[in-house]
Every structure is written in structure tokens, then in C-alpha cells.
Amino acid sequence: MKKVPLNCEVCGNRNYNVPKQSNLASRLELKKYCPRCNAHTLHKESK
């Protein structure tokens, strides 16, 4: 497993590094807390 960064879709801030299995082809999408937006927002895997 390697760690991939997650970016907030609202503000673009890179908030989390989460482990991801390398055999998954799709990009990771999680609803996480963003301290900059002060809300739970969708976070997508960045490159």
C-alpha cells in the first residue's frame, strides 16, 4: 500500500494522506473534514 494525498473539492487544500491499495484503478473519494472550510466536504485523490 502507498499513501496518496486527498484534496478538498471546495478550497483545493491538501488535507490528508491516506493509504491506498495499488490494485484499485479508480480514484479515491472520501467525505472528510476540511479545517479551512470548517465543514465536511468531498476529498478526491490527487496525483
Curated annotation (Swiss-Prot):
It holds the Pfam family Ribosomal_L33. InterPro entries: Ribosomal_bL33, Ribosomal_bL33_CS, Ribosomal_bL33_sf, Ribosomal_zn-bd. The gene is rpmG3. One of its GO terms (biological process) is translation. Keywords: Ribonucleoprotein, Ribosomal protein. Belongs to the bacterial ribosomal protein bL33 family. The keyword Transmembrane does not apply. This is Large ribosomal subunit protein bL33C.
